[in-house]
Amino acid sequence: MKIAVDAMGGDNAPAVVVEGVERARDRFKDIEFDLFGDPQQVRPLIKDATRINLIETTEMIEMGEEPVRAIRKKKDSSIVRAAVAVKEGQADAFFSAGNTGAILAAGLFIVGRIKGIDRPGLTSILPIAKPGSGAKNFVYLDSGANAESKEKNLLQFAQLGRFYAENVLGVNNPRIALLNNGTEEDKGDRLHKEVHQQLKAQGDLNFVGNVEASALLAGEADVIVSDGWTANAALKATEGTAKMMLTLIKNGIENGGLRAKLGYLFLKPVFKKIAKLMGTSTYGGAVLLGLKAPVVKTHGSADALAVENTIAQIHTMIESKVIEKTVSYFGQVQSEENIDKPSKN
C-alpha cells in the first residue's frame, strides 16, 4: 500500500512529519510513502529513504488561506498534488496536518464522494473517560465538515460511523447515539426529533437513543452522530473544560504549599496515565468519511507520535477495506431507492 503525505502541512512541518513517517515505515513493512513538498526543506530531514519517495512541489497552502480558492489556484501545492495522486490511483490514501478547510476541499473536489453519499462527515476518534468502561474510544461525526445538515445527512453519518467502528475499531454491532439536548425521545428541534425517529426505524443500526453533551466521553455509545455545528461546539466545549481543569489543578499544586507538592509527586504516574488517555497524539487523525479513499487530517500541532499513530489508523482502514465496504453498501442503497422511485411514464 502507498500513502500520499503532505510533508509541508502543520505547525511543526516538515520535521515532525518526516520523523513520524519514518517511525511508521519502520513499524509497518508493507507501507510505501510519497512525500510531497520542498526538497530543500524535506530531504535533509530524511535519515533513511527506504520506501520513501520525495516528490517536489513548488507551492504551499498556508493555514489562513481560503480553502476552495487555494486548491484551485495552487495546483502545485503539496495538498493538491497528494490528493491528485490518490484520485489517479498512484496512492491509496492521503494524509496531512495542514489547512483543515483545504484538506476537506481537496478531498471533496479532487478525491471525490462515494456514489450515494450527499455530504462526507469529518470523523474524530475520541477517548472514553468513564472508569471501568470496556471500550477505550468511540467514533464522533460530523465534527465540523458541515455547518448545516439535513436529516438524510445524519442518517448517512450513522451508517458511515457504523462501518468505521466495525472495521477499524473492531466493535461488533456498535451502539449508535444521537447528540441532543436531552436523553428523552421528544427532545430537540424538529431536525433532531425527526432524525431520532428515522434512526430508530433503521433495522441495521443498533440505535440506543439520545446522548447529552455532558455524557460525551462517558462511553454510552460506540458512535455518536450530530450535525457539524453542534458536534464541533460540543467538542470544543469539552476540550476547553479539560484544559481549564488542568490549569486549576496546576495552579492548586503550585500555590498549595509543601503538602500539595508532595501529593503531586505521589500522583505523578496517575496524571501521566490520564494525559496519555486524553492526549490528541494517541488516537490518530480525523477522517473525512464518505470519500472514495481515506483522507485523514491530524491536528496542526501534531508531534511525530501523532503522525505515526495517524498512519497506523490509515493502515487499518486500508487493510480492513472499510471504504470498499462502504461503497458497496451505499451503492446497494441507491439501487434500491431507484427501484422504489415511481416511473415517469
Swiss-Prot record:
Chain segments annotated as coiled-coil in the UniProt record: none
Coarse class of the protein's main subcellular location: cytoplasm
Cellular component, GO annotation: cytoplasm
Gene Ontology MF, one: phosphate:acyl-[acyl carrier protein] acyltransferase activity
UniProtKB keywords: Cytoplasm, Lipid biosynthesis, Lipid metabolism, Phospholipid biosynthesis, Phospholipid metabolism, Transferase
Pfam families attached to this UniProt entry: FA_synthesis
Enzyme nomenclature, EC number: 2.3.1.274
Protein role: Catalyzes the reversible formation of acyl-phosphate (acyl-PO(4)) from acyl-[acyl-carrier-protein] (acyl-ACP). This enzyme utilizes acyl-ACP as fatty acyl donor, but not acyl-CoA.
BP GO annotations: fatty acid biosynthetic process; phospholipid biosynthetic process
Pathway: Lipid metabolism; phospholipid metabolism
Annotated InterPro entries: FA_synthesis, Phospholipid_synth_PlsX-like
Enzyme kind, highest EC tier: transferase
Protein name per its UniProtKB record: Phosphate acyltransferase
Species for this entry: Limosilactobacillus fermentum (strain NBRC 3956 / LMG 18251)
Subcellular location: Cytoplasm
Family that this chain belongs to: Belongs to the PlsX family.
The protein's assembly and partners: Homodimer. Probably interacts with PlsY.
Catalysed transformations (reactions): a fatty acyl-[ACP] + phosphate = an acyl phosphate + holo-[ACP]
